[in-house]
């Protein structure tokens, strides 16, 4: 098949904060270098950035209270450059411990969680703003292009192949067929977010994770709630711990006030949860039904929804960050501080350091592994390590359970983290159904009244996500053996994908031909969170990109 090729000098894959910050930093370095008159002159370079969303920010979701450290370094006068992403500044912080009926405020915020004066932002708007900054500097932006394969030559990464468009559900070419293009790059920087497709290809091909702990995740589900005028407290941040999670499941919740009479509410739940019936969307609705939370938000209505995996392994989960011709940045490389549940600033800094390494590679005309290894040295010498390394045993501490884990973390803050403790991949923690509750099937859920406005079911929230996929295309969720779903998984785990998916993609339907329940995949519901790929106990589900430009339209999340 003939494919169009596009040569570029540096290709950033992913339109998140890591790659956008990296692209901006690289363009600034090139401009300063050329203005200085130093040799070699780096003119007529092509720096490109591609993203699978219909536009930059379409798939962006985060809390988010921003630690502005990296942004201050990247664009020192950002406050004077029309920061359209800014919702509020934090003015009031509360930390609540919840039981099923009561709430207990803490006298102080936990160490590292204080955010007074920090910006409350929309991550989607932030990425659009960064994209405009990058484009103004000359970066070529390509939205709606999903990377499906890395390109190689003589053992070195040489770019990315984008996905074909116009393939029907049988794998045949439609009249609208367009073959993907080969974007050939001297340096490829991968920042696809958690569980990135190309990032995993790179890690697997070069064994980049052989000396690191597994990447582990939480699922974050978030809604934006529109409130009656005058009922939103300006700059309010509420963090909660406890209900609706049990003491074996790590996670927590947040409520942030936004501009325009809106609150954001989100819940994070560890994907290492032992209970196969864990359902983050259902737990979010239970949280909203808590008396304290309902008193705050109950007069509102849900207007936006999204879900995404969050990397929480921290420092020990960071793989080798470079390979011949390529580097990993952001969530694709586990740049998040699990103790603070903050990663935007770390992702941005990783992208900036990768850009500095790419800049040196361009000057030398050499992107071999030996040259790109400077990226890892730069990370180790930066405040990324200063912030992340002391929390290196946060995740293994939480594997003990919430109470024991918090005690271990407290001791490590006082006396240091000690030796690195190993931990397991998330799916290895799931207990078989009978071990959790001693019976089959899952218990009925009749404790919530879904009003379609404040307490909403999954399909209503899928609508609020704005997700769209062309139905007549191959499913982008690949299950190796559906017979396992109908037999072994049904018996041992009760088909947990029907619960842990926050978009009701997976359903078991009775089949008259086989006389048993069979797996049905409603891939058009998918919000690209990657939970199934991570939590499936048999690891037989693989998420791959659908046609570029499809998926959720988060906009304000």
Q: Model regions: which residues?
A:
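FAD-binding beta-loop-beta segment adjacent to the flavin cofactor pocket
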Residues: 307-338, 461-472, 485-500, 507
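Active-site-proximal substrate-binding core of FAD-dependent oxidoreductases
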Residues: 40-44, 334-340, 352, 356-402, ...
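Predominantly flavin-linked oxidoreductase catalytic cores and closely associated redox partners
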Residues: 41-43, 124, 128-129, 133-295, ...
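Conserved Rossmann-like nucleotide-cofactor binding loop
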Residues: 18, 55, 195
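C-terminal helical "tail/cap" subdomain of flavin- and related membrane-associated enzymes
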Residues: 359-456, 468
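Iron-sulfur cluster-binding cysteine motifs and their immediate structural context
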Residues: 491-524, 530-553
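N-terminal FAD cofactor-binding segment of flavoenzymes
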Residues: 25-29, 42-100
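N-terminal Rossmann-like FAD-binding beta1-loop-alpha1 element of flavoenzymes
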Residues: 8-48
């Amino acid at each position: 098949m003939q494919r169009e090729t596009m040569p570029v000098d540096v290709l950033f894959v992913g339109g998140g904060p890591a790659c956008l910050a990296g692209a901006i930093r690289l363009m600034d370095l090139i401009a300063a270098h050329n203005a200085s008159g130093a040799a070699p002159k780096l003119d007529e370079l092509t720096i490109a950035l591609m993203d699978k969303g219909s536009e930059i920010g379409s798939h962006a979701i985060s809390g988010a209270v921003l630690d502005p450290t990296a942004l201050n370094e990247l664009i020192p006068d950002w406050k004077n450059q029309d920061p359209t992403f800014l919702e509020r500044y934090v003015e009031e912080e509360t930390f609540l411990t919840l039981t099923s009926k009561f709430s207990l405020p803490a006298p102080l915020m936990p160490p590292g969680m204080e955010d007074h004066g920090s910006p409350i932002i929309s991550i989607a708007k932030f990425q659009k703003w960064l994209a405009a900054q990058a484009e103004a500097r000359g970066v070529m932006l390509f939205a709606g292009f999903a990377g499906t394969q890395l390109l190689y030559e003589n053992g070195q990464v040489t770019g990315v192949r984008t996905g074909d468009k116009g393939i029907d559900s049988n794998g045949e070419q439609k009249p609208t067929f367009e073959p993907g293009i080969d974007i050939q790059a001297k340096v490829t920087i991968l920042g696809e977010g958690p569980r990135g497709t190309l990032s995993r290809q790179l890690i697997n091909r070069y064994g980049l994770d052989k000396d690191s702990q597994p990447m582990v995740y939480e699922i974050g589900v978030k809604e934006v709630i529109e409130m009656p005028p005058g009922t939103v407290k300006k700059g309010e941040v509420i963090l909660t711990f406890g209900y609706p999670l049990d003491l074996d499941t790590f996670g927590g919740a947040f409520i942030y006030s936004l501009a325009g009479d809106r609150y954001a509410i989100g819940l994070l739940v560890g994907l290492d949860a032992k209970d196969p019936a864990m359902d983050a969307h259902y737990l979010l609705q239970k949280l909203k039904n808590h008396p304290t939370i309902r008193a705050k938000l109950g007069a509102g209505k849900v207007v936006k929804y999204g879900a995404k995996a969050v990397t929480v392994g921290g420092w020990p989960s960071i793989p080798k960050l470079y390979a011949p011709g390529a580097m990993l940045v952001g969530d694709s490389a586990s740049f998040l501080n699990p103790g603070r549940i903050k990663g935007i600033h770390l992702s941005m800094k990783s992208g900036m350091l990768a850009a500095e390494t790419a800049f040196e590679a361009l000057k030398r005309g050499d992107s071999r592994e030996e040259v790109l290894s400077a990226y890892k040295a730069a990370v180790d010498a930066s405040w990324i390590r200063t912030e992340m390394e002391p929390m290196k045993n946060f995740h293994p501490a939480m594997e003990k359970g919430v109470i024991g884990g918090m005690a271990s973390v407290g001791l490590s803050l006082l006396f240091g983290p000690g030796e690195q403790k190993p931990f397991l991949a998330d799916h290895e923690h799931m207990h078989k159904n009978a071990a959790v509750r001693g019976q089959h099937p899952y218990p009925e859920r009749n404790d919530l009244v879904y009003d379609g406005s404040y307490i909403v079911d999954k399909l209503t929230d899928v609508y609020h996500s704005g997700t769209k996929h062309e139905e007549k295309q191959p499913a982008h969720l690949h299950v190796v053996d559906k017979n396992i779903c109908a037999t072994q998984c049904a018996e041992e785990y009760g088909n947990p994908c029907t619960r842990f998916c926050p978009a009701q993609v997976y359903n078991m339907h009775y089949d008259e031909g086989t006389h048993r329940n069979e797996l049905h995949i409603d891939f058009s519901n998918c919000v690209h969170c990657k939970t199934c790929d991570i939590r499936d106990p048999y690891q037989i589900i693989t998420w791959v990109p659908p046609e570029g430009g499809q998926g959720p339209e988060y906009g304000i999340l």
